[in-house]
Amino acid sequence: KLVLADYNRARAEEVQAKLKDKERFPVEWVDAGKQELIEALARKHGVGLIMNACDPVFNMPIFNAAYETGCHYMDMAMSLSEPHETDPYQKPGLKLGDLQFEQAEKWEKKGLLALVGLGVEPGMADVFARYAQDYLFDEIEEVGVRDGANLEVRGYEFAPNFSIWTTIEECLNPPVIWEHGKGWYTTAPFSEPEVFEFPEGIG
């Protein structure tokens, strides 16, 4: 059984109709910002895994609800970052995923698995980089990720590939950089521009 839970119940019902099996894919309304509602649904349906496909602003209530109800957990974007309070363009504050990673030991003690950041990057980019390290190259000096797309969704004039608010936040927050020998540091947004020509057909 897979519970389709959404704040907009009609959208969950659309998915259910496409799947043509109401018993196997029950629909529920949920406010992902309210941990107690998520816990109640998990207990009602005997959920074993919570797959979070919400905007990352809702990650922590969902993540914490999974822990409290003994569910394994997956998300696509990790807990949000926060700039350093006094020196945002030199020092990192709270990095993406810090709030989740700091709970790893207690999840492990409870026998629960949380796979976070399984979207494009981190996520797919990490898998590709590890594959390249293990099977394609003798030595890697740097891994760089560049985004480019010509995404089109029928019926929409503008279609971002993820939450538009998350994309804006990622562009405006100080970029967090890690360098061997230097560790983590930040710089001002757009302060170190790079011109990169994508292959034909992208961008």
Residue ranges and their predicted role:
Residues 76-112:
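Rossmann-fold NAD(P)-binding glycine/threonine-rich loop
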Residues 15-25:
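Short, conserved SAM-binding/catalytic segment
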Residues 2-3:
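Short beta-strand element of Class I
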Residues 107-203:
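Rossmann-like dinucleotide-binding core of oxidoreductases
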Residues 29-49, 54, 58-62:
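Conserved Rossmann-fold cofactor-binding substructure of NAD(P)-dependent oxidoreductases
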